[in-house]
Amino acid sequence: MAFARLALIFFLAASVMFAVKETEAGIPCGESCVFIPCTVTALLGCSCKDKVCYKNHVIAAEANTVNDHHLLCQSHEDCFKKGTGNFCAPSLKHDVKYGWCFRAESEGFLLKDFLKTPVDILKMSNVIGN
């Protein structure tokens, strides 16, 4: 009897999981943005389009120009101007003329921050190490 209950629980969990998986792609993020922008779902990667919150990749896939979405770019300068990152990654599809803005932390940025550290802190860490 316990085996039958356990099998039923696994069956229900699997059916719910597959039902959710099928509806993920094009469904809005769950809130409207008529008067206020996507607030809670913005952390989940949602943006406002046509007064409904959609996932960013859905909006970007339907975009015709770079100006249709704040994360789309054609160069690194587009990302700087829009304030959405510092690196424009090109699309994997060769027929798509735009890319996606990312905030990239490279070794140059880390070195720049390291060079701004006061000299006293560097001496202190050397004393602690000895």
Swiss-Prot record:
Database matches in PROSITE patterns: CYCLOTIDE (PS51052), CYCLOTIDE_BRACELET (PS60008)
InterPro entries linked: Albumin_I_a, Cyclotide, Cyclotide_bracelet_CS, Cyclotide_sf
Pfam families noted in UniProt: Albumin_I_a, Cyclotide
SUPFAM superfamilies: Cyclotides
Tissues with expression: Expressed in root, seed and nodule but not in flower, stem, shoot, leaf and pod (at protein level).
Chain positions listed as propeptide in the UniProt record: 57-130
Keyword Signal carried by entry: yes
Keywords of the record: Disulfide bond, Knottin, Plant defense, Signal
Stretch forming the signal peptide: 1-25
Protein task: Probably participates in a plant defense mechanism.
Similarity annotation: Belongs to the cyclotide family. Bracelet subfamily.
Official protein name in the record: Cliotide T7
Annotated source species: Clitoria ternatea
Lineage: Eukaryota, Viridiplantae, Streptophyta, Embryophyta, Tracheophyta
